């Protein structure tokens, strides 16, 4: 079974593309969602986070105090890197366990916004970048997440690799720019990945 990473900047349409692959019977591991889940549910990871960031990192009911943790790491690269060093190995283990449950599939997808930035793409067989220009991604994100400000979205974009960097690193590109059929692109790529 091949392990294929799928990434793209915020608002590029990664989840939409993954849904098309799922219609073809290809399972998708949503790494960003699982990272959040693990931070609230994995006892070992919770203990590490509480040790490094204080007991305030969790509410009394055991749920992650996202706003506290966000304030702790926002603007502090050292703390953010520490959090990533705690979370990413847990996600990698979770992904590998998930893969064993899907060993009968020709390939699986690992959807992650920071696939290249974290280096996790190096453990995969190939990568797909979902591409859309920055203006379109900004528009989509503001429509999808009305609580976000334009400044907030642009700040997230600045922390992600540029379109050019992602394109250079990716093995395959799917253009989700409203000028080409994503279904046709996914179908063609699916055929290649089955070989």
Name these PLM-found stretches:
Residues 89-93, 108-113, 154-159:
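Short gly/ser/thr-rich secondary-structure transition/capping motifs
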Residues 122-123, 134, 144-192:
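Small-molecule kinase domains that catalyze NTP-dependent phosphoryl transfer to phosphate-bearing small molecules
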Residues 1-33:
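Walker A (P-loop) phosphate-binding motif
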Residues 94-101, 107-142:
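ATP-dependent NMP and nucleoside kinases share a basic, alpha-helical "lid"
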Residues 3, 18, 46, 66-67, ...:
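A general structural signal for well-ordered alpha-helical segments in protein cores
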Residues 13, 32, 83, 109, ...:
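Residue-level signal for inorganic ion chemistry
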Residues 33-106:
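ATP-dependent small-molecule kinase phosphotransfer cores
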Residues 27, 33, 126, 171-172:
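Well-ordered beta-strand positions
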């Amino acid at each position: 079974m091949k392990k294929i990473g799928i990434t793209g900047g915020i608002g590029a349409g990664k989840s939409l593309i993954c849904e098309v692959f799922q219609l073809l019977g290809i399972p998708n591991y949503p790494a960003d969602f699982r990272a959040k889940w693990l931070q609230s549910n994995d006892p070992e990871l919770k203990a590490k986070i509480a040790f490094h960031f204080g007991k305030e990192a969790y509410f009394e009911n055991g749920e992650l105090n996202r706003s506290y943790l966000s304030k702790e790491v926002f603007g502090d690269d050292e703390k953010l890197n520490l959090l990533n060093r705690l979370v990413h190995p847990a996600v990698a283990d979770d992904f590998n366990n998930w893969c064993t449950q899907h060993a009968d599939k020709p390939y699986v997808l690992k959807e992650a916004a920071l696939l290249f930035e974290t280096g996790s793409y190096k453990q995969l067989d190939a990568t797909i970048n979902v591409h859309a220009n920055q203006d379109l991604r900004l528009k989509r994100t503001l429509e999808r997440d009305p609580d976000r400000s334009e400044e907030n979205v642009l700040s997230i974009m600045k922390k992600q690799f540029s379109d050019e960097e992602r394109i250079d690193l990716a093995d395959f590109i799917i253009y989700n720019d409203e000028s080409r059929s994503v279904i046709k692109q996914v179908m063609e790529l699916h055929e290649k990945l089955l070989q």
